[in-house]
Amino acid sequence: MSIQKLNDTTNSGYVSSEETDSLLVSSSNPSKGGGRTALLRQVKSNSTNGPTTGASTSSSGSVSGGGGGSGSGGGSASGSAAGASKPTLMRQDRTSTYLTSPQQSQHARMGSEESMRGGASGAAGHDEDVEQGLVRSSIVPDIEVHEEDQEQHSQQLNATTMATMTNNQQQQQPTISIMNLSLKPGDSHSHSSSPGSHPNLGTSSYQNLASSIPPSVPSRCRACRNCSRRASTTPTTLIDRSASRDSVKSAFQQGNLSGSMAICISNSALPQQQQLQQQYHLQQQQQQHYQLQQHHLHQQQLQQSQQQVPPVLITSSPTNGSRIIRQSSQPESSSTAICCGPHSACVGHAHSHSHTVPNVSLKQLRESSGDGIAGIAADSLRINGGMRPFKQLRKPASTLSIPGSMKTPSIANREQISSGCNEEAAEALVGIHSDYPRYEMYMEERALTGGNTSRKPSTNSAKHKPNVGYRLGKRKALFEKRKRISDYALVMGMFGIIVMVIENELSSAGVYTKASFYSTALKTLISVSTVILLGLIVAYHALEVQLFMIDNCADDWRIAMTWQRISQIGLELFICAIHPIPGEYYFQWTTKLANKNKTIGTEMVPYDVALSLPMFLRLYLICRVMLLHSKLFTDASSRSIGALNRINFNTRFVLKTLMTICPGTVLLVFMVSLWIIASWTLRQCERFHDEEHANLLNSMWLTAITFLCVGYGDIVPNTYCGRGITLTCGMVGAGCTALLVAVVSRKLELTRAEKHVHNFMMDTQLTKRLKNAAANVLRETWLIYKHTRLVKRVNPGRVRTHQRKFLLAIYALRKVKMDQRKLMDNANTITDMAKTQNTVYEIISDMSSRQDAIEERLTNLEDKMQSIQEHMESLPDLLSRCLTQHQERIEQRRNFLHPDTAAVAPIQAPTPQSMFNAAPMLFPHSS
């Protein structure tokens, strides 16, 4: 094994300049192998997202060909024998090189099976052109690394040229061979003699690629030959870093060459300018050969249908062995070679592979969205898997609600998943209602880079998106619809009750019988209204379920069907379904008459009585309508405030607010309605057995007496139906009486303003009484003193009278003081607490302002202390300079006065420490 550095021009589109410095090449001993090359290594490993392969093997790969041209022919034969092999890419010391397939056992000096396929197996159906096999699942075009001398290479080129010209109409799989030629002395110019010595370089395949492609040679896309896309082997050494994509593209279009031409340049000491001139002549010859064979290649492209698997890239390091680098960010899928532009060369692809889905990553590659240097860097990152981590930046915030089949799509369901959509990342676990469109979900990236997320609408998508604004609008529309349906239900319920009352009153008055047409017509009308009412109730609860689904992001209406909701719906339907049916039906009703000496009475009673009374239960719809029409329920601001305070807006809350706002009106309406309904129902139950109850006024008297909890007992119910109604009236009446007392007491209570006025007036009166009582005490004291001390004759009766008044004045004074204390205690209301709070706030504000002033003074003091400290720190230096100057002046004066001491060494400047620690200095005086 020998390691040689290739030229700078060997840089491919996917290999950096650092990687080309350590390409491993293998050169066999000329004495043993006759200058034949040996493959370094044949590695067969698993791709990170492709099928597994066998273990890695290595073989010499050299076959004696018999002469200069037989070697090339032998290579072709051995290459065709392993047409189904899976070549891999080996990476040594950060160097990406393509090696031959691990299943090949013998190779010619020019290396790969596809390079010689035209000479040995051109008619085989397993071969495919590069346009159809570029992006397959697991096979990659080969790159062989060789090192040979110039004589053997010239023989091989001649043999290869003959094989290529003979089979130029057959399809050839692209193969790139990178070789480092060792020239002998004197043969340095043998490789650049004339363009005619390399007739095979103008073919349309990638065969016989020797050495590296210089930067001046434009290379085309391997998928289609007529576009200006850079192939993976396009050199980038001489491209200026500031060059744009258009400039690079125009430079590539000048040669109009295919991406499969090979140029052999000797590794000699030729100047670079001469090499470039030789390459230009070779390009002209290659262009002519390419134009002759292009027509035949297009015909062959239409006949090829075999598909291959995408290439596998394997890198290895000389220290830690081989490791797998992911080339693509998706599972394997059947895809076609992507054409870089819409031209005639790509007709075969669109015709033969119309059923496949183009690769999204290659679509990105042909989008003109960057310059040449950026495209080269992106290609390198894609091949080496460096773009894989950036895929996470385009994923949703959460994938908990995304099904597993959508997270990791397989080959079978990839197209179905690409046409559908995943769940929203922020979506609730219960999903979104099916009536509303789901968001256009992020698709799984299918490109080498992770791809751009393609958005496609769902099959169940509507014309609106279920965002927050749409949901709020839909919720508001459902609220309005629910309110209208509730109003209609109340109207139909009240209509049925009114018709029922009319029918019973007409039949009880003897206007018609139950068997008459009028009775049947009215009952039929009641039945029709009942059916409509049941439908409205079902529609109301359907809207309730839809609102629940919108509020909770539910996807299935059965989620909202709890046992409580089902029971409520069933109970409402049962209550509203009860009504008198058309026809004449009677039953025998036997009861004990309490008003007639407890005799037993039996009467034939129609079923309409038992079916009519429960119809009054439909009045519960009034509470629902009150709730839906309440300003507290319909106003958005009140609902927002209630939601912030965790208040549930239901019928109970609305009734409480009504009792707070207008308690007297609500209580009066309720009591009067209950009184009328109870009186009519009691009359219907009792009129068949007792004539007294046939009169509505008697029933109203009994109901009122029972309602007020008086109970005279002059009229009593006989049937159990009447007794039950009376019992209900008594219980409800007790509650209404308590409510009436509460309402009256609240009405009689003083308001806060009235309380303040009353307290002020009472305080004024008590103050006056206190002054009067004090004055009376003083007056009686003076009178007692007067009648006992200032008179000549003391009158005991008058003295006792004034003493009695004196004590009464003292008692009055004490009582006034006690009343003042009670008034002060009662005056401690919320307003007084507010005053106290204001006082405390003022005190705290004053303390806060003082504290701020103290902090400001402390800050100023700290600044001053810091400045003093800085001056103190600079003081030693200043003293040192002053003392030094003073010492110098003293020395000068001493030298001037005493010249004999001038020979003494100059004194160094004292340090601050030495100055403070030194002994006192004695200065001489001049005499």
Swiss-Prot record:
Bilayer disposition of the protein: Multi-pass membrane protein
Q: Where is it located?
A: Membrane
Q: Where is this region: Calmodulin-binding?
A: 763-839
Q: Which keywords does the record carry?
A: Calmodulin-binding, Ion channel, Ion transport, Membrane, Transmembrane, Transmembrane helix, Transport
Q: Which residues cross the membrane?
A: 489-509, 530-550, 569-589, 609-629, 658-678, 724-744
Which superkingdom heads the taxonomic lineage of this protein's source?
A: Eukaryota
Which InterPro entries does the record associate with it? CaM-bd_dom, CaM-bd_dom_sf, K_chnl_Ca-activ_SK, K_chnl_dom
**Biased amino acid composition, Polar residues:** 1-31, 95-107, 200-214, 314-336
Sequence ranges of Low complexity compositional bias: 45-62, 219-232, 296-308
**Bias kind Gly residues: ranges:** 63-77
- GO terms for biological process, alphabetical: potassium ion transmembrane transport; potassium ion transport; regulation of membrane potential in photoreceptor cell
A Gene Ontology molecular function term of the record: photoreceptor activity
Record-annotated disulphide pairs: none
**Which stretches does the entry tag as region Disordered?**
1-131, 181-251, 296-336
Q: Which residues lie within the membrane without crossing it?
A: 696-716
Q: Which GO terms describe its cellular component?
A: membrane; neuron projection; neuronal cell body; plasma membrane
Tell whether Transcription regulation is among the UniProt keywords.
no
Q: Which family does it belong to?
A: Belongs to the potassium channel KCNN family. SK subfamily.
**Role summary:** Forms a voltage-independent potassium channel activated by intracellular calcium. Activation is followed by membrane hyperpolarization. Thought to regulate neuronal excitability by contributing to the slow component of synaptic afterhyperpolarization. The channel is blocked by apamin.
Subunit structure as annotated in this protein's UniProt entry: Heterooligomer. The complex is composed of 4 channel subunits each of which binds to a calmodulin subunit which regulates the channel activity through calcium-binding.
Q: Enumerate the PANTHER family for this protein.
A: SMALL CONDUCTANCE CALCIUM-ACTIVATED POTASSIUM CHANNEL (PTHR10153)
| Full protein name | Small conductance calcium-activated potassium channel protein
Give the species this sequence originates from. Drosophila melanogaster (Fruit fly)
UniProt lists the gene as SK
